[in-house]
């Protein structure tokens, strides 16, 4: 057994920055376990967590307001290093006797910081050197307020032209404040700064690796489940697939997976899932072919939200029916990941593992009394993918573009019919195939085809045809909260259009969606 991968840990207190989860992901990349909590935690909770260091995140509030968030006083009395980032630096300064004011000159975007005094956090870290020999850092700023006076026992380490206290430090207490964001890639030395803080100043060892996570998770699953049986809804998506393989490694044939083919999957997806998990990995899988049942339930329904609810309810019904056939099952496994936990955690309650209802299978009969198994609940999506690779899942499967839970149910506009799904599957497969051939698939964040329930006249040979329209959609995004439409080459789009119209009998016109998010959403429904 490897060393306890949770022994060394960093606590990140969240003040609401859009980059806070990125801080946690960077710390994990360094190889150290960390957790992300709301800023208003209690002293008791911090003591119980026993971190090696604490990071105060940025945030949208102003420390000049009376009711703005503050770090718990215990943070500065815990005897561990503290790093304040942006708002975190400002509240650190304010709480320890410094001063913060609303700045007349806001800094958003690229800036250059000049390091004037040496300190352990920035020793030998620089991007360039000024004319008078001072180290310079290329950083990313995003702040309106600024520190105008640092606490008495702090030293000014660096400044910019408009920010006199860009970095401050109390080396004796190991307290550091930076006005910029080291967690974003625009701060070129950001990862080096975080490594220095976590590994050197906090004294953490890099124990958090994919191989160690697998070993630790399997051991904990064995301990939690014992000799019991587990049921899992396997979709073929990243989270449920990695969950299945971790459980398979821990308990083998005592895991039963239920794979429901709802008729709303991608071309040949059901066959691929069965070949992968039943064939290659020899998992115990119940394959439920339920296309007719789903399409019957959806017949005549045009409203997108009602379609989603019908699909979800029908899935739960089928899963329940299969689950009650397995009286030996004592546990329900889910692919809940850490961002789900973060979103669900109630502020200052300590209930960090309350899961949102839409992530649960839900609807199971109460008398089943199944325990919940969530092997991925500490992991970010990128960590889940790396573990999947380690477990033997193919790269192309793990790094596929996102596919919505309701599947083609939200990509066939209006009423869902088998004819529409079959046409859409074939058209979408051509689009994705051509993206791969042109080496464009990994250059866009998400690409798919939408079936439009309108007919358009077309000409084939000497005849006219009156067939359906599909829209191609491809976007580029970092976080899926906003997105730009992908500027795919015209000749590529022409090639895809020609193939779809010539090879998919029933489609006469192909259009390309050039809407950004906002105002449009990425999916059409």
From Swiss-Prot:
Pathway: Purine metabolism; GMP biosynthesis; GMP from XMP (L-Gln route): step 1/1
Entry superkingdom: Bacteria
Stretches assigned to the GMPS ATP-PPase domain: 208-400
Binding site for ATP: 235-241
Keyword Transferase: no
Active-site residues per Swiss-Prot or TrEMBL entry: 86, 181, 183
Function: Catalyzes the synthesis of GMP from XMP.
Name of the protein: GMP synthase [glutamine-hydrolyzing]
Organism: Proteus mirabilis (strain HI4320)
């Amino acid at each position: 057994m490897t060393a306890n991968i949770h022994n060394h840990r960093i606590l990140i207190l969240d003040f609401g920055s859009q980059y806070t989860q990125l801080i946690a992901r960077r710390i994990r990349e360094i190889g150290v376990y960390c957790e992300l909590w709301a800023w208003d935690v209690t002293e008791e909770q911090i003591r119980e967590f026993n971190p090696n260091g604490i990071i105060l995140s940025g945030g949208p509030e102003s420390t000049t307001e009376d009711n703005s968030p503050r770090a718990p006083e215990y943070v500065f009395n815990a005897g561990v290093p503290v790093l304040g980032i942006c708002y975190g630096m400002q509240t650190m300064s304010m709480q320890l006797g410094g001063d913060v004011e609303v700045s007349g000159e806001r800094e958003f975007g690229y800036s250059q910081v000049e390091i004037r005094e040496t300190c352990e956090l920035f020793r030998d870290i620089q991007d360039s050197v000024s004319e008078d020999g001072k180290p310079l850092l290329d950083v990313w700023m995003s702040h309106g307020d600024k520190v105008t006076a640092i606490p008495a026992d702090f030293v000014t380490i660096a400044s910019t032209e408009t920010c006199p206290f860009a970095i401050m430090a109390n080396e004796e207490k190991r307290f550091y404040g930076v006005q910029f964001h080291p967690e974003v890639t625009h701060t070129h030395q950001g990862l080096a700064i975080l490594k220095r803080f976590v590994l050197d100043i906090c004294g953490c060892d890099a124990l958090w690796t994919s191989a160690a996570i697998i070993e630790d998770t399997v051991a904990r699953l064995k301990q939690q489940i014992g000799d019991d049986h587990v049921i899992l809804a396997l979709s073929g998506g990243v989270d449920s697939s990695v969950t299945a393989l971790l459980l398979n490694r821990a308990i083998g044939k005592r895991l039963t997976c239920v794979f429901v083919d709802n008729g709303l999957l991608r071309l040949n997806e059901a066959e691929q899932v069965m070949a992968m998990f039943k064939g290659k990995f020899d998992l115990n899988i119940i394959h439920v072919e339920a296309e007719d049942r789903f399409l019957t339930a959806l017949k005549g329904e045009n409203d997108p939200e009602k379609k989603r609810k019908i699909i979800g309810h029908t899935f739960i019904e089928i899963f329940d029916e299969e689950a009650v056939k397995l009286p030996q099952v004592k546990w329900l496994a889910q692919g809940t990941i850490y961002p789900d936990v973060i979103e669900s955690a109630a502020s200052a309650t300590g209930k960090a593992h309350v899961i949102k209802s839409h992530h649960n299978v839900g609807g199971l009969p109460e008398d089943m009394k199944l325990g919940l198994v969530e092997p991925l609940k500490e992991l970010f999506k990128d960590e889940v993918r790396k573990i999947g690779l380690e477990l033997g899942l193919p790269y192309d499967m793990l790094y596929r573009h996102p596919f919505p839970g309701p599947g083609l149910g939200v990509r066939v506009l209006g009423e869902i019919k088998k004819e529409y799904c079959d046409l859409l599957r074939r058209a979408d497969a051509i689009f994705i195939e051509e993206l791969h051939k042109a080496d464009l698939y990994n250059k866009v964040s998400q690409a798919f085809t939408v079936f439009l329930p309108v007919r358009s006249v077309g000409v084939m040979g000497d005849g006219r045809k009156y067939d359906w329209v599909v829209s191609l959609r491809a976007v580029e995004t970092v976080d899926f909260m906003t997105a730009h439409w992908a500027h795919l080459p015209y000749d590529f789009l022409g090639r895809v259009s020609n193939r779809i119209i010539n090879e998919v009998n029933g489609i006469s016109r192909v259009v390309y969606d050039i809407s950004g998010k906002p105002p449009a959403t990425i999916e059409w429904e």
